Amino acid sequence: MTCAEVNIWQIMEYFGNRYKNYRTILPSEMFESVMDTSDVRLLPSDGLTVEQESHVFMKCGLAPKIYYKRSEYDDGEFMKSYEQYRRAPNFEEILHFYVESGIPVLINLREKGNKEGDNHCITCIGHALKENIGKNYIGERDDFLSRMQTTKKYLIDNDDKTEYNRLNLIGSWVNCSGYVILEDHSSPYQIKSLDDLKFSEKENAIEYEIESFVVPLYKHVFMAAEDAYEIAVDLLDRSYYGVVEGLNRNGLNPPYELVIRLFLTTSKSYKNFRINSAVTENEKVFYSQIALPKFIWVCEYGTSKTYMNHKILGEIVLDATSAKHHIFESVISVRNGDSVTYRGPADPNSYVHLRRKLPMEKEFAMYEENNLKRIC
């Protein structure tokens, strides 16, 4: 078996043993599933293309999504390439969102700086954290808006100077010190930086870089990570004054710095966690009664201090089974401390703005269930 086949086999071992919707796959079944898509002989195996990797996952009942770091085009004389994800979120950030969600991601590598070099395949199943979160901002309001190509700008006048309101966002991924990697020729559970992908101690060991990755998703997860990120950040921007009001209630003053964390999870696990970690009866009743789709994207936010204490100040819940259309159509609830909005399946978009005050804790538990488990 080649590296791609080994990694697909172990990913399907995970899905088949954990979820009743999937089953494990034999090497012979993997061979049969790509027979119709191959124009060359399959034995002896030369490995799988990215499209064939995705096809195997499709045959196993998953709905994979492929991300390429670079794309090629013909300029009429030569084939040229360009980086696809130059704006927020970038290629590595998208990868992190899926890893943060506890999804095993199939990563395709190429020898660094050599287009004709060796290819390789690994699986990423988690990440390690630094002791203290750094302040590498995603950007101030004007920066992350321009990176997202958003044309709308919210300005205030200060004497003769026009300035942006400042809301500094820090991605939780800047606190990542490395990723947990499974590689078929070395010891498992290695923690590697994405900038240092070597799998041998030899002096002439090949150094790899990521060329693409395949995310095996549940078939009804229609919202991609980059869309969930854009909606969440845009909503934070539109809700700037409400967010600041919540920060002020918690005794925080400018400059406002928020750590955001984005992940995909099941509504069942999310509701169970929120109910079990609730402090007040009102909180338990609220989370037990809200209607949620099977899968949701959650964007948590808090300060660097609350983040390190595994607490948050607010969260945005998005419908992961919806496609990206209008910003508010996928928003289910927004909680900012003890202020919360909720829009049911049949409610209009205007309900996203309908805030209600509930006797709930202003700081509440960071979600740590059914995605990545902490190993101390």
Predicted feature locations:
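Cysteine-nucleophile protease catalytic domains, especially the papain-like/related folds used
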Residues: M1-M79, G302, A323-H326
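Generic ordered-secondary-structure signal
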Residues: E5-F15, P104, I122, E183, ...
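General structural signal for secondary-structure boundaries
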Residues: Y19-E29, T49-Q52, R87-E93, N165, ...
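Active-site-adjacent substructure of cysteine-protease-like catalytic cores
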Residues: M58, A63-Y154, R166-L167, R374-C376
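Noncatalytic regulatory segments and standalone regulatory/sensor domains
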Residues: A128-C376
